[in-house]
Amino acid sequence: MKADAHRRHAESLERAIALAKSDPATSVAIIENAWGAAYHWISYGCIRKYQQHRDKHQGLTAYLVGLGEQRLAQWWRNFEDVRQAGFYGNQAGESEVQEVLELLERIRAWATT
Protein backbone atom coordinates (compact mmCIF):
# COMPACT_ATOMS: atom_id res chain seq x y z
CA MET A 1 0.00 0.00 0.00
CA LYS A 2 1.30 3.46 -0.85
CA ALA A 3 1.63 6.31 1.65
CA ASP A 4 -1.51 8.15 0.54
CA ALA A 5 -3.60 5.00 0.90
CA HIS A 6 -2.35 4.55 4.46
CA ARG A 7 -3.23 8.18 5.19
CA ARG A 8 -6.74 7.75 3.75
CA HIS A 9 -7.29 4.59 5.80
CA ALA A 10 -6.16 6.36 8.96
CA GLU A 11 -8.44 9.32 8.27
CA SER A 12 -11.39 7.01 7.57
CA LEU A 13 -10.88 5.19 10.86
CA GLU A 14 -10.59 8.51 12.68
CA ARG A 15 -13.91 9.57 11.15
CA ALA A 16 -15.50 6.38 12.50
CA ILE A 17 -14.06 7.21 15.93
CA ALA A 18 -15.57 10.70 15.78
CA LEU A 19 -18.97 9.22 14.97
CA ALA A 20 -18.75 6.65 17.77
CA LYS A 21 -17.48 8.94 20.55
CA SER A 22 -20.94 10.07 21.61
CA ASP A 23 -21.95 6.51 22.59
CA PRO A 24 -20.17 5.13 25.68
CA ALA A 25 -21.05 1.58 24.59
CA THR A 26 -18.60 1.89 21.69
CA SER A 27 -15.39 2.02 23.72
CA VAL A 28 -14.03 -1.28 22.36
CA ALA A 29 -14.76 -0.16 18.79
CA ILE A 30 -13.09 3.19 19.41
CA ILE A 31 -9.98 1.49 20.78
CA GLU A 32 -9.85 -0.94 17.84
CA ASN A 33 -10.34 1.83 15.27
CA ALA A 34 -7.74 4.01 17.01
CA TRP A 35 -5.30 1.10 16.95
CA GLY A 36 -5.93 0.60 13.22
CA ALA A 37 -5.57 4.31 12.52
CA ALA A 38 -2.32 4.39 14.50
CA TYR A 39 -0.95 1.49 12.45
CA HIS A 40 -1.78 3.32 9.21
CA TRP A 41 -0.28 6.59 10.49
CA ILE A 42 2.90 4.75 11.44
CA SER A 43 3.05 3.19 7.98
CA TYR A 44 2.44 6.57 6.37
CA GLY A 45 5.14 8.21 8.48
CA CYS A 46 7.67 5.45 7.87
CA ILE A 47 7.18 5.71 4.12
CA ARG A 48 7.58 9.50 4.27
CA LYS A 49 10.62 9.44 6.55
CA TYR A 50 12.36 6.17 5.63
CA GLN A 51 10.87 5.19 2.23
CA GLN A 52 9.81 1.86 3.75
CA HIS A 53 7.30 0.41 6.17
CA ARG A 54 6.27 -2.88 7.74
CA ASP A 55 3.30 -4.55 6.04
CA LYS A 56 2.10 -6.23 9.23
CA HIS A 57 1.64 -5.10 12.80
CA GLN A 58 3.44 -8.18 14.16
CA GLY A 59 7.00 -7.21 14.96
CA LEU A 60 6.27 -3.52 14.48
CA THR A 61 7.82 -2.51 17.81
CA ALA A 62 11.16 -4.14 16.95
CA TYR A 63 11.01 -2.67 13.45
CA LEU A 64 10.54 0.83 14.85
CA VAL A 65 13.38 0.37 17.34
CA GLY A 66 15.55 -0.75 14.42
CA LEU A 67 14.77 2.54 12.69
CA GLY A 68 15.84 4.42 15.81
CA GLU A 69 12.26 5.38 16.67
CA GLN A 70 12.26 4.25 20.32
CA ARG A 71 9.64 6.78 21.43
CA LEU A 72 7.27 5.74 18.63
CA ALA A 73 7.93 2.09 19.45
CA GLN A 74 6.94 2.75 23.07
CA TRP A 75 3.74 4.48 21.99
CA TRP A 76 2.89 1.47 19.81
CA ARG A 77 3.68 -0.90 22.69
CA ASN A 78 1.35 1.12 24.93
CA PHE A 79 -1.33 0.96 22.24
CA GLU A 80 -0.98 -2.81 22.01
CA ASP A 81 -1.30 -3.18 25.79
CA VAL A 82 -4.45 -1.06 26.02
CA ARG A 83 -5.96 -2.73 22.96
CA GLN A 84 -5.39 -6.24 24.28
CA ALA A 85 -6.71 -5.36 27.74
CA GLY A 86 -9.84 -3.89 26.18
CA PHE A 87 -10.48 -6.54 23.57
CA TYR A 88 -9.60 -9.62 25.58
CA GLY A 89 -9.75 -8.44 29.19
CA ASN A 90 -12.88 -6.30 29.30
CA GLN A 91 -10.88 -3.20 30.26
CA ALA A 92 -12.23 -0.67 27.81
CA GLY A 93 -13.56 2.23 29.81
CA GLU A 94 -13.39 5.97 29.47
CA SER A 95 -9.79 6.23 30.71
CA GLU A 96 -8.59 3.63 28.18
CA VAL A 97 -10.40 5.44 25.37
CA GLN A 98 -8.78 8.71 26.45
CA GLU A 99 -5.35 7.06 26.57
CA VAL A 100 -5.57 5.63 23.05
CA LEU A 101 -6.89 8.89 21.64
CA GLU A 102 -3.91 10.72 23.15
CA LEU A 103 -1.53 8.09 21.75
CA LEU A 104 -3.21 8.38 18.35
CA GLU A 105 -2.75 12.15 18.41
CA ARG A 106 0.97 11.76 19.16
CA ILE A 107 1.42 9.16 16.44
CA ARG A 108 -0.46 11.26 13.86
CA ALA A 109 1.72 14.26 14.75
CA TRP A 110 4.87 12.15 14.36
CA ALA A 111 3.70 10.85 10.98
CA THR A 112 2.74 14.23 9.56
CA THR A 113 5.69 16.37 10.70
Residue spans for each PLM region:
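Terminal alpha-helical segments
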Residues: 1-113
